[in-house]
Amino acid sequence: MAKKDYYQILGIPKSAEEREIKKAYKKLAMKYHPDRNQGDKTAEGKFKEIKEAYEILINEEKRSAYDQYGHAAFENGQSNSTYSTFTNSADFSDIFGDVFGDIFGGNRTQRAKKGADLCYNMEITLEEAVKGIKKEIQIPTLQKCKTCYGSGTRTGTKPRSCSTCHGKGQIHIRKGFFTVQQSCPTCHGKGTIITDPCNLCHGQGRVETYKILSVKIPPGLDTNDRIRLNNEGEAGANGAQSGDLYVQITVKKHPIFEREGNNLYCEVPINFTMAALGGEIEVPTLDGRVKLKIPYETQSGKLFRIRGRGVKSVQNRNQGDLLCRVVVETPVNLNEQQKNLLHELGNSFHGFRGEKNSPRSKRFFDGVKRFFDDLTR
């Protein structure tokens, strides 16, 4: 049975360039791949045709021979092996890897593997978070070996190219009608072999050590904010780029202030005479004390805003506010004279339902009375 023309199989003209061949192959291989057509013998046969056509046309020498002699150019020299290892078919593996990813072509060389990122948890006080601070930290890490400068070899020597993968770090294995790409078992994907390792790092190119860094904390950071320090993570393998260091911020609980966004909150206790008659008190801020006027007849829970005494925004440098919540404190440990004065004051209110002096109390008890009246109807 006559074989079908390779150009027709891929649906391309005989003048097609390399990029057109790859594009056509990617489209057809994705459509007819056995993993997408399980149990479909027709699709399996079609995929074999597509693969065979691609391997011939993507190779300049084979394509030239095919253009001159057709299928006869390969009838005597074609391999019947169903399992063969080869290392010089990069074009096919690259295109196959583009289509099917890590399953068939995802194990790339490990020669330039970036170092791992590190995370450091830093606790700071609220004052430090608001004003900013510079702190020194010590972190365990892997650093580039100072003896071999990351090469892993003894001074004056170099790694030799792996003879199995010819320095590529990967090999390709043909199994039946498809090809599998995997890391080279000899060099473990590095592409090179160290025969004379460095005495300090023993061929690893990196050594375990502690690194001391000075970290600048800008004003305005809050819990769960992170600072990224580029290239301060672990050194990369084989002299590759270092990873990054992330400093995770946790702000300690403050005994007076609570933070919400860029605003600070605090509770300020006042006695009931101050609440009733008004006056002036001093309240704390992170920059010192400030005076706060309490108007007469102030109720417990009222919020007073002191502008510009909060936290500066780390984004736009706008300053938040300090909000003071007044808590009216009931007096305790009263002496007889004080108790008598309070009794006298209470009598002057004409009872606790006084409409004029305690409007909230009157509204409450009027509501209670209506509630019970409704129950007894």
Swiss-Prot record:
**GO terms, molecular function:** ATP binding; heat shock protein binding; unfolded protein binding; zinc ion binding
Detail which positions bind Zn(2+) 1.
Answer: C145, C148, C198, C201
Q: Which InterPro entries match?
A: DnaJ, DnaJ_C, DnaJ_domain, DnaJ_domain_CS, HSP40/DnaJ_pept-bd, HSP_DnaJ_Cys-rich_dom, HSP_DnaJ_Cys-rich_dom_sf, J_dom_sf
Under CDD domains, the record lists: DnaJ, DnaJ_C, DnaJ_zf
Principal location listed in the UniProt entry: cytoplasm
Where the record annotates domain J, the positions are: 5-70
Q: Name one GO cellular component term.
A: cytoplasm
UniProt key word Repeat: yes
Ranges for the CXXCXGXG motif repeats: 145-152, 162-169, 184-191, 198-205
Q: GO biological process annotations for this chain's record?
A: chaperone cofactor-dependent protein refolding; DNA replication; protein refolding; response to heat
Q: Which HAMAP family match?
A: DnaJ (MF_01152)
Query: What does the record say about domains?
Result: The J domain is necessary and sufficient to stimulate DnaK ATPase activity. Zinc center 1 plays an important role in the autonomous, DnaK-independent chaperone activity of DnaJ. Zinc center 2 is essential for interaction with DnaK and for DnaJ activity.
Name of protein: Chaperone protein DnaJ
Protein species of origin: Buchnera aphidicola subsp. Acyrthosiphon pisum (strain APS) (Acyrthosiphon pisum symbiotic bacterium)
- Gene of origin? dnaJ
